[in-house]
Design a protein with these regions (language model features):
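Glycoside hydrolase catalytic-domain context in secreted enzymes
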Residues: 1-677, 684-698, 705-709
Length: 709
C-alpha cells in the first residue's frame, strides 16, 4: 500500500468537506451478527458507516445503495474472515488452513490460492479479507494454531508475503495482517493473555513477517486482543505509531479486533470508562473500531470538548480513504468479477495442487504407496467421514449451532469418500470406532471397528481432533489424543493388519503411541474440500508426497513449547522423564524417493557486513520416483554479543527432480541475513564466523562456514 499523489489530493479535498460526524463514521465498522440495542445496525446503515463486517450478497448491495444516498456518498468497505478461501460462503472453494498450506513450503501455489480467494470474495461483492494470520504458533496449547503458518519467523514472512501478493495483485480485495503483534505467544498458550516479551524480542521474532507483508503491499492491519509486557496492543503507541508507521512506512489503515476497545475497560483495566478507552485506542494509532457501537458518539463528543485533537481523526480517515480510493470504490471504478468464478475449475485445480503438496508423510515402513489395490480396505476412525473436522475453523458452519443442518457441496471429499473414489475395485468397509471426545456410543462403535479390521487386508485409521478443540477460547492444557482414540488404535493393531494412520487435526498432537503402532503415518491438518481425495491419492501413489512440517511435534505436552529456534540451555530439550527431542521436528517430511545433498559451498569465504553472497548445493534424486524436494538453509552465529538461537531458518527452495536427476540450488543472501537485533533495537551483523547448514531436514544437514569482516 503506497500513497498515490492524485488520490492524496482527492482525499484532502474530501476530508475538508466532511463534518466531524461524517469523518468519525468512516472510522467505524459494524457487523450484522453482533448484539446491539434495537435499531442500532439500521441507524448506522442510514448514517453511512465506513465499513461492514460479514454482510454478504444482497444485504451488502442494500448497504451500498443506502451509502449512495448520504450527503458525502462515501462507499463502505466490506470485510470477511476469508482465512482459507471464501469459506463463509457455502459453495466457494475451501482450501487447506494456513497451517496445512504452510506444509507445502510453496510460495507460488500459496500466491495462486490468495488470488483465487480474492476472485471469489470479490465476485461475492466484498472488498477486504481478514488474512493472513502472521502469529507464530510456538506454544501449541493455544487454540488458534491452525490459523497460522506455523512456528517460524522466516517461513511465516515468506508465505505471508506470497498470499498478500495473491490477494492484492489485481486490486480485487485488500489483505489484513493479523494479529499485530505477538498474539500467538500469550502466556501459557491462553488466548488473549499477556505476551511476556521485550521490544527487542518483538523486533527479532514477531515483527519481520509484518515487515515482509507490508513490502508485499498489504493495505490493512488488525491489532491483537492481548498485550505485550503489560501494554494492551490496542493501546500500544510505540508499536502502532513509532514502529509500524515511522519505521516500516505502513500507509494503510489499522483496525481493532472484535470489540477490542471494550476489553481495555473490562479485561485489561487500563481505562475506567468507554470515553477513555476510545481516546486511548485512537491516539495510540487505531484508525477503525470494530463493533463498539458507542465509538462514534464518544469520539465526536471528545473532539468537541477538546480532549482529542481533530488532526488525529483526519489522519485516521485519510488512511481509510486511501485504501478505498486504491480499491476503486469511488466513481464507479470498482472492478467486480462474475459469480461464475466462484468454485470455477481453475480454482478447484489450484486447491488440488496445494492440497497435494500440503500433506506430510511422517512415517513409512515401506507399506506405501499401495501399488496393488487391496481386496478389502477398512476405513476406521472418528475423522474418517467428518467434513467439519476436516474443514477446521472459519467456514460457513464452524460458528453455528451444532443442531443446524448445512448441506455439504458435492465436491467435498472425506478420507472415506476419497478411498472409495481412488480404490473403486476394492471393497471399502467403514466403522467410526469412537468419537473424538468420547460418548456413550463408543463401545458399540469400537466392536464394529475391530470386526472390520479383522476382516480387512489393510486399515486406514483416521484420528485427530475437531472444531470443539480448536479456535478462539479453545486453548488446551494437553495435546494428547482425546476420548478413546488411543484405545481404538491399540485394538485395531491387535487385529494384526497393516495400519496407515491419517491425522486430521488443527495442530500438532502427541501421537507417539499411535505412530509406533502404525506402519505409515500421514499428517493432513485441516485440508479443506479435497483433503480426503488427495490423501487417498497419496496412499495409492498417484503422486509423491513433498510436504514438510512448518511446526514441531512434541512427544508429550510437558515439553511445550518445543519450537526449534530456541536459545541453548545446559540440557537443551532434555527432561529427565521423557526421551530427548521432539517426536517430529520442524522441516521434517518423508517422500517415496530419496534425495542426496552434496557440494555445499559459499561464493565468498569472507564478506563485509553489508555484502551479498551465494550459497550453493547439489541435490540428486537417487530414488525411483519423480518428486519435489524442499532444501532448507539454516544459519548460526558461533559467537555473538548477546545469545542467538541454536539455528535459524534463513532460506528454502522447493525444486522438482525426476528420478536420477541432479540440480544445483543457489540461495542469494546478504550479510544482514546473518545478523540479529541488538539491545539498542537495531539490526547488526557482528564480525566473526558463521555456520551455514543446508539439507532436507534438521537431522540431515551439510555444513559450511563464512566469515564476516
Amino acid at each position: 500500500m503506497k500513497k498515490n499523489p492524485e488520490n492524496e489530493k482527492k482525499i484532502a479535498s474530501l476530508i475538508s468537506e466532511m463534518t466531524l460526524e461524517e469523518k468519525v463514521l468512516q472510522m467505524f465498522q459494524i457487523s450484522n451478527v453482533a448484539e446491539y440495542p434495537e435499531g442500532t445496525y439500521e441507524k448506522f446503515i442510514e448514517a453511512g458507516a465506513g465499513s461492514f463486517l460479514h454482510v454478504l450478497g444482497k444485504d451488502a448491495d442494500a448497504v451500498r445503495d443506502a451509502a449512495a444516498k448520504t450527503r458525502m456518498k462515501i462507499p463502505p468497505i466490506f470485510g470477511i474472515d476469508a482465512i482459507h478461501g471464501h469459506a463463509f460462503l457455502n459453495g466457494a472453494v475451501v482450501f487447506p488452513t494456513q497451517l496445512g498450506m504452510a506444509c507445502s513450503w510453496n510460495e507460488e501455489l500459496i500466491e495462486k490460492m490468495g488470488q483465487a480467494t480474492a476472485e471469489e470474495v470479490n465476485a461475492d461483492g466484498l472488498d477486504w479479507v481478514f488474512s493472513p494470520v502472521l502469529c507464530l504458533a510456538r506454544d501449541t496449547r493455544w487454540g488458534r494454531v491452525d490459523e497460522t503458518f506455523g512456528e517460524d519467523t522466516y517461513l511465516t514472512g515468506r508465505l505471508g508475503a506470497a498470499i498478500v501478493r495473491g490477494y492484492e495483485k489485481d486490486g480485487l480485495v485488500i489483505s489484513c495482517l493479523k494479529h499485530y503483534i505477538g498474539y500467538g505467544e500469550a502466556t501459557g498458550g491462553k488466548d488473549s493473555y499477556d505476551t511476556e516479551a521485550t521490544i527487542r524480542k518483538v523486533r527479532e521474532t514477531f515483527l519481520p513477517p509484518f515487515a515482509e507483508c507490508i513490502k508485499a503491499g498489504a493495505s490493512s492491519i488488525m491489532t491483537a486482543y492481548g498485550s505485550i509486557d503489560g501494554t494492551p496492543l490496542t493501546a500500544h503507541r510505540t508499536l502502532m505509531r513509532d514502529i509500524l508507521r515511522d519505521e516500516l512506512g505502513f500507509e494503510g489503515f489499522v483496525v481493532t479486533d472484535w470489540m477490542n476497545i471494550y476489553h481495555l475497560i473490562k479485561k485489561q483495566r487500563v481505562a475506567g470508562n468507554f470515553d477513555d478507552a476510545a481516546r486511548l485506542a485512537v491516539e495510540s494509532g487505531n484508525d477503525m473500531s470494530m463493533n463498539c457501537y458507542e465509538f462514534c458518539d464518544s469520539i465526536v463528543k471528545q473532539v468537541r470538548e477538546g480532549r482529542i485533537d481533530e488532526s488525529i481523526i483526519d489522519e485516521a480517515v485519510a488512511n481509510i480513504l486511501r485504501v478505498k480510493f486504491a480499491l476503486g470504490l469511488f466513481d464507479g471504478k470498482r472492478k467486480r468479477l462474475p459469480r461464475s468464478v466462484i468454485a470455477c475449475p481453475e480454482h478447484i485445480e489450484i486447491n488440488r495442487e496445494l492440497t497435494r503438496e500440503s500433506l506430510v508423510l511422517l512415517k513409512n515402513n515401506g507399506i506405501l504407496p499401495l501399488k496393488n489395490a487391496p481386496k478389502k480396505i477398512a476405513v476406521i476412525g472418528p475423522n474418517a467421514d467428518d467434513i467439519k473436522a476436516q474443514f477446521g475453523d472459519w467456514v460457513y458452519f464452524s460458528h453455528r449451532p451444532e443442531s443446524e443442518h448445512y448441506p455439504i457441496k458435492n465436491d467435498c471429499y472425506t478420507v472415506l469418500r476419497g478411498m472409495k473414489e481412488i480404490f473403486p475395485d476394492s471393497e471399502i468397509v467403514y466403522a467410526k470406532g469412537c468419537s473424538v471426545r468420547g460418548d456413550e456410543s463408543d463401545e458399540a462403535e469400537m466392536t464394529l471397528a475391530v470386526k472390520a479390521a479383522e476382516e480387512a487386508d489393510i486399515v486406514i485409521l483416521v484420528l485427530g481432533d475437531d472444531i470443539t478443540l480448536n479456535g478462539e477460547c479453545k486453548d488446551r492444557a494437553t495435546l494428547e489424543l482425546t476420548g478413546r482414540q488411543n484405545e481404538l488404535a491399540r485394538k485395531i493393531k491387535a487385529a494384526g493388519k497393516p495400519i496407515v494412520t491419517v491425522l486430521v487435526c488443527g495442530k500438532p498432537l502427541c501421537v507417539g503411541d499411535v505412530a509406533e503402532l502404525s506402519d505409515a503415518l500421514i499428517e493432513t491438518f485441516n485440508s479443506g474440500d479435497l483433503g480426503g481425495l488427495c490423501t487417498a491419492e497419496l496412499i495409492a501413489g498417484k503422486y509423491n508426497p513433498s510436504g514438510k512440517l512448518p511446526i514441531s511435534f512434541p512427544r508429550t505436552s510437558g515439553q511445550l513449547p518445543c519450537y526449534y529456534a530456541q536459545y541453548p540451555g545446559w540440557h537443551y530439550f532434555r527432561y529427565c522423564d521423557v526421551e530427548e527431542g521432539n517426536l517430529f521436528d520442524f522441516g521434517f517430511g518423508l517422500s517415496y524417493t530419496e534425495y542426496e545433498y552434496s557440494d555445499l559451498s559459499v561464493s565468498k569465504s569472507e564478506i563485509a557486513p553489508d555484502e551479498d553472497f551465494e550459497v550453493s548445493v547439489r541435490i540428486k534424486n537417487v530414488g525411483s520416483y519423480d518428486g519435489k524436494e524442499i532444501a532448507e538453509l539454516y544459519t548460526r552465529d558461533t559467537v555473538s554479543s548477546i545469545m542467538t538461537p541454536i539455528r535459524l531458518l534463513k532460506g528454502f527452495s522447493k525444486i522438482a527432480l525426476r528420478a536420477g536427476e541432479e540440480k544445483t540450488v543457489t540461495f542469494h543472501m546478504n550479510a544482514a541475513d546473518l545478523g540479529f537485533i541488538g539491545n539498542d533495537g537495531k539490526r547488526v551483523t557482528e564480525p566473526g564466523k558463521f555456520e551455514i547448514f543446508v539439507g532436507g531436514s534438521l537431522s540431515s544437514l551439510l555444513k559450511t562456514e563464512i566469515f564476516v569482516k
